Amino acid sequence: MTTQGRAILADRYVNKGTAFSADERRRLGLDGLLPPVVEDLDTQLRRVEVEYSSKQTDLGRHVFLRALQDRNSVLFYAFLEQHLAELLPIVYTPTVGLACQQWSRIYRRERGLFLSWPQRDRVEELLDNAVGDLDVDVVVVTDGERVLGLGDLGIGGMGIPVGKLALYTAGGGLDPSRTLPVMLDVGTDNDALLSDPLYLGWRHQRVRGAEYDELVDAFVDALGKRFPDVMLQWEDFAQLHANRLLARHRDRICSFNDDIQGTAAVSVAAIVAGLGTAGTPVGDLRLVVVGAGSAGTGIASQAVRAMVAAGDSEHDAERRCWLVDRDGLLHDRMQ
């Protein structure tokens, strides 16, 4: 390792804090930068638990964990894995929704890649700035327009890719240094954010149409050029863009949309398992989906494919699926 001193402590992926041994401190120029006591991971975890327990609100706990993740990745994931069931609702839903709403007010330190529309001609440069000499295997990208059930949160939507990737490391073992959260900041139509003096995103109404595609295309091209084997996850895009972007880019880069495909895969797997337990053929399925957004339409489409795979015609399978939203049953004669 050629990095020395404060640069090591600033690198979240190599910083061990008080766990650096006496020999490591001498060799790496850390003497004088840390308290003299050398601690093992268990002792560090006890200190984290004491401080975490002192937080009075879920948002306060979320902010504390994010700060820990930003300074010491090993310690953060050790604590997360040790208390996974307790911490999942803090790191991700439901608390991450509040954190996204307050994102510009609780911002502490850089993480991931921010691409705003005015920077669309510098995408490759900004990607290089964000990743440095690291390799990236998994990217989660959002434009913040449909964050959970909270709507348009602009740049605050960055909390979702960060949280998702933390779960993938804790639950799936991904190397956190090989993951990248990305925010495509094309503006926001949320007037409260645009008028907030602390808002950190591009202060502009959302760019749409060909201009929107210009930034997304530049991002996908740059990402595929730098990391040809990367897996890209589209996250929390409005239905207007979700299916279209997936179709537009799925043959250009390995990608999927969790709201459309991930939710559908889990839901239809549960339906098929339930039908099997009940002894009911998949071809006898009658399905009503409440909610006709990206997830609802994705579930219906996946269910149709399951019925076709079981021997039904696509026409018959589609006739046994209904979608209901706030206006009632959807049909082709609606205005």
Give the residues covered by each predicted segment.
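N-terminal ligand-binding/catalytic initiation module
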Residues: M1-S255
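Glycine-rich phosphate/diphosphate-binding loop of Rossmann-like nucleotide-binding domains
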Residues: R252, I260-Q335
